[in-house]
């Protein structure tokens, strides 16, 4: 029994070293998960909205209606781009950023087709 335990402890100590080649092989041969680009997010936006995953909000930004990582990534990338554009418009026109966001939100909600989600002022989502 002592021999078996001693052997097991030695193997347990060496196991990470024995697995290292297999782990390295996996790292080398597995392609990395590519991060979504803004262009890909913009291409995926229409489908995500049509599927009820994303919707327009009064603050000018996209909101996640149905939690999933893809929808969250699309919203994050597009919202970052929107925020940059809103800042530029506010700066160029010497107006408050919040005013630009609210106007953009109003226009986005007006342009949202029937059947897609919009966020109500009370925070609830509803189909337009």
Each language-model region and where it sits:
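Intrinsically disordered, low-complexity repeat segments enriched in small/polar residues
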Residues: 5-6, 26, 31-32
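N-terminal secretory signal peptides that target proteins for export/translocation
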Residues: 1-11
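N-terminal cationic amphipathic segment used for targeting or macromolecule association
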Residues: 10, 20, 32-33, 88
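Hydrophobic alpha-helical segments, especially transmembrane helices
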Residues: 14-15, 83
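Anionic, Ser/Thr-rich low-complexity intrinsically disordered regions
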Residues: 2, 34-128
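Bacterial N-terminal signal peptides
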Residues: 16-29
């Amino acid at each position: 029994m002592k021999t078996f335990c001693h052997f097991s402890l030695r193997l347990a100590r060496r196991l990470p070293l024995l697995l290292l080649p297999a782990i390295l092989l996996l790292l080398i041969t597995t392609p990395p998960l590519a991060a979504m680009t803004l262009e890909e997010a913009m291409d995926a936006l229409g489908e995500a909205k049509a599927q009820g995953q994303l919707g327009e909000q009064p603050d000018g930004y996209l909101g996640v209606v149905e939690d999933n990582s893809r929808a969250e990534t699309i919203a994050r990338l597009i919202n970052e781009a929107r925020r940059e554009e809103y800042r530029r418009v506010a700066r160029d026109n010497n107006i408050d950023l919040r005013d630009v966001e609210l106007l953009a939100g109003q226009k986005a909600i007006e342009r949202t087709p029937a059947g897609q989600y919009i966020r109500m002022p009370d925070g609830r989502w509803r189909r337009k």
